[in-house]
């Protein structure tokens, strides 16, 4: 088989370069250890008590007062803030959905904001996300 191109195997340990994918995995790991507070009320309580270690805000939140409040509390208490483009995607990442038999998300509830109070294990995605936040 002289004309065949060499087959290059994908590296399974390839580092992630997309912060949204890394954020999704970090949220999933935090959900496993009950370290996520979802919604405005829980987020504001965690930000006030300074138990939040990372705040995530949906940029398409329909209430501008929510956005101002969360941004102000996060900056006042020096808690890193990441904005995601879609509140439906954030709701799916936060587990606010039903899964069908094919494990596809159904009936996704929009989530305007969430905070991570406890990270799961310190994975490569966690390290990448913290490095990304420190560069901002």
Swiss-Prot record:
SUPFAM superfamilies: L30e-like. Keywords: Ribonucleoprotein, Ribosomal protein. It comes from the Eukaryota. Signal peptide: none annotated. The keyword Nuclease does not apply. GO terms for biological process: maintenance of translational fidelity; response to bacterium; ribosomal small subunit biogenesis. It holds the Pfam family Ribosomal_L7Ae. One of its GO terms (cellular component) is extracellular matrix. GO terms for molecular function: structural constituent of ribosome. Belongs to the eukaryotic ribosomal protein eS12 family. This is Small ribosomal subunit protein eS12. It comes from Dictyostelium discoideum (Social amoeba). The gene is rps12.
